[in-house]
Every structure is written in C-alpha cells, then in structure tokens.
C-alpha cells in the first residue's frame, strides 16, 4: 500500500498555486482569517488531518487549528522543523505521522492525535523511520513498517491503548532499497501478507524471506530463507499450512506456521518450474507451473486432478465459480482456456497480442491485449462482440446506474458494455478531447447529464448520446510527466508491455465484472472504513471518531465540482472550482503569493490559504 493513496475520503492537498481563468465568477465567502505571526512567527507549511483540523508548521512549533473557526486547539513548541514530505494521515483515524529534526539529536518520527495534539509515539533517538502501515481492525492494531538505517522493522500499535505494543527487527535491507533506508520513501517492503494463522501468529514475506511472528509479543518464532525472491506465500486455514514458492523454481515448500517446520510431502513435486500459487473459493490451493496447473487438496496435500492442465505460455490462472480460466501470455501465440472443476478443458481460444488484462464476467472472459479486446463466451469459446475493440491503452471506466452499463472511453471512442448480456455498443465516435492522447491517464465518472472524463488538469463531458458538451485542458506549473507515472504503475502491477492509462481503471473493471456496480471510490468507502476502525478502538473514548465519521459521511455526497489549480497566459495563478456538468468555473480564488501554501478540502468544499507565510484564511466555496 502506498502512502500517497491512503486517505479513505477525497481530500486534495495542493502545494503550489496556479492562475485564474478569466470570466465573471461568483465570489467565495471568507469564513475566518487568523494571523499566525504571534503563535508561529512564520508558517512553513499547512496540511489537513482526517478530522478536518488544519495542521500548521512554523518557527515556533507545530499547531492544530479548528477548521471551522480557525482557533488554536493545540500547539507543540518542541516540534520545530517538522518535515512536510514526511506528513501522512493514517486512514480512517484522527492520527498522523510526521518527522522532525530537533536542534540537538537525530531525526525523530512521531504519531500524533490530530484532535488533541497528544504525541502517542515518539521514536526519540532510536532513529526509526516509518515507511507505511497496515490497518488490521480484526486484530485491533496498526502494523507499521519501519527502517533504521539499513534495517527493516515492524511495529505493532494498539488501537485500544493507542500505544506501541512491540517493535521487532527483521534484518538488513538488501538491494536498491538499502540506499533508501532512512529516506522519506513510502514504499512497502512487505511483498506477501500480513496474514494470520489459526493460532493468531503474524506471517509476512519480503524478498527471499518469510517470517512467523508472535502477534502479542513481536517475537520471531521462525524465519525461512529461499534461494531467490518468493513468488508466492499462501496460508491455508483448512490444513493450517503455509505454501511457499520461488518463481521458475522446481520446488514447492509447505511449512507448519507455528514453528516454520518443513512438512512438504514427498509426493508433492513440481514437474516444471513454479509460476504462481493462489487459492480458490472452494479452499483448494491452485498450483500454477510451467507444465500446467493443478489443485492441491489442503486436507491431504495431494494433487486433486490426475493430470495437470497444460497450455504453452501459461502465465495466469483465474479461479471463478464455474471453474478456472487459464491465460497464456505471448505476443504471437497467446490463448485463453476454460477448464472446469474436474480439470477438463471446455475450450481453448487463440488470442492476438499479449494479454495484459483478463477478468470473468457473467457471459464470458473479458480480455484486453495489445492487439484487440473482446469477450470470449463461456458457452462456446467464441467472441461475443461482432467486431474486436482495439484499445491502445487502458480505457477510462465508470458505471451508469440508470442504463445498467459499463462505460468505457479510449482513443476518441466511447463504448457501452452490458455485463449481463455481454453486448458492446459504440455510443460516441471521433470525440476529440483537448490535449488528450492515448497515453493520458484519463479517468471517468457518470453524471446525470453524461460522462465526465478528467485528470488533475483536464475536464470533459460527453452526453449520453455521444455528443461532446465541453472539453478543457488547464496549464499546470509542474512539469511532472503523469503518463510516465501511470506507466510505472502498470509495470509494478505486472504489465510488462507498452500500455498507458490509469491503473485505477483496471481495478474498476475488476470491481464491475464481479458485480460491484456502484463505483467503489474512496468517498463511498469512507464511512464503512471509519466505523470498522472505530469499533476496533471502542475502548478509547478520546479519538473523535464522531468527527471523522461525519466528514466521511459528507464525502459520500456526490460532488458536483472539481478543484483545479492553473495559470493563465499572464502566469496569474488561481484555484478554480469547475462545475462538472457545465465545465464553467463557478468560483475562483486568486493567489497573491508566488509560492503560496494552501489546502483544498473537497469534503467540506473549502479552501485554506496561508498568505505571506503569516495569515491563514478559510474560504467557503459552496
């Protein structure tokens, strides 16, 4: 889990200002204005916590301000020099992590209760750096990943006591990340897990290592080191066994999770090299190797099928209710096969191009390759769509609740896809969106008047009949190449082909194909997540969960506007509140500073600006 995606509701933090677009705009309301000269001397940066409070760092310390009144709630004079790049809200909780460098001593990391300013954890002189975290509400803990120079550590933080339970050392970091041990990088070093055995032990895997850890004390009960990085680490509660495998290895290992004892049965041997291990809804272990795939009965560790199912270039197996979909990935000889629950082939269909995305739908297998896209029918293995759809990149995806169809847009063309019937219709053609190419990581949202397509700097609306209502690209100050960032995400997700677009669209396709017809965005998930975290910390009465719950509830309301920062031809900077249905800037805030500090709160529709590093102003944009 990456820290930059950890908010369960949609707040956009903005570090630069941009310019006003001309036109007559409705004036915004100034809610409050606070001079920070006396309290902080000079404001270095501002952020917003999950409870809505504004966190301001200055020469005289770190302060929490009530976002509704601007009044100081707490101040920590000892926290001078807090590093903004290290600031990270902890999802669903009124907690945040930050680092600061005291006048004397090493850089410290702190976890703060944003509503009270209480320091719940301080690394002090231990020189720890928190990288990322895992919320584990069933266990009532937050598991923090930390580093100390070139050493990996885990910390268990109790939600009931709001304090550290234990810290355990996992050993020296190997490879490139060793150079980043004490930097502010937020990437997780856990590749598999965290997961828990029947006895409650914590199991994690990273690179070539697997660990069994006492979840109560942090004691490492056992560690296992493979020859190469682990491809899979799967725990089966049915037989209380842990399955480990290294990619392209001819060995599968089974461990007893309490002591890490090797209990691999002699009869469980690979015929080829390991590609993957996963599980299905029937609690079987799915073993995928170069010589085919088979099922392991977790009760006996025997192979269930007499003969493994094999196709050339096998790379992925997708379990589903009716059986298994085997995907062979090759640019020239790819194929997709349907295998029933007994291991019998129902059909095997050749596919043009390298398949970088496949999922099951009600009618068949939806796939996207570098050459074409279609649905292969479960009934006969033939294409459902009369004509192939060729996507140059991952399409923008949303769902129309009224028409009950998936909406996809890519390369000037809009498609309506009925998951129930498998029908695909083109509803928009030759739609030219301003400065949008096939590499643009475009995302989509269904609106009452049509389909809204956007990036951080782009807005467009196409009505439901396929007519372009408006399209606009807004200049940005930063030269960051967002398409290259999107491609990096694709590579991380295992897509080793020349494909651009937003990885969020691939996730959305997965959700929709599995029946999640309501867009599963951060805003709609917020309240449920907060309630889960609140129940996990029910014994602690000072966590302001009612505040965070209210803000999450607000975030569920459909947002009619999008905030964009931009500049005009004269380099005049502004924050614009763009109406998604009209494309017009309903409100704007002009910025006076060359490098201003501000936060856009999309939940309460407010903008907080710090002018001249002295005065924080709150504007209501409703």
Task: Give short role names for the model-derived ranges.
Residues 23-622:
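Secretory-pathway ectodomains
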Residues 4-5, 21-24:
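Absolute N-terminal positional cue centered near the fourth residue
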Residues 10-22:
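Bacterial N-terminal signal peptides
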Residues 1-12:
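Bacterial N-terminal signal peptides that target proteins for export
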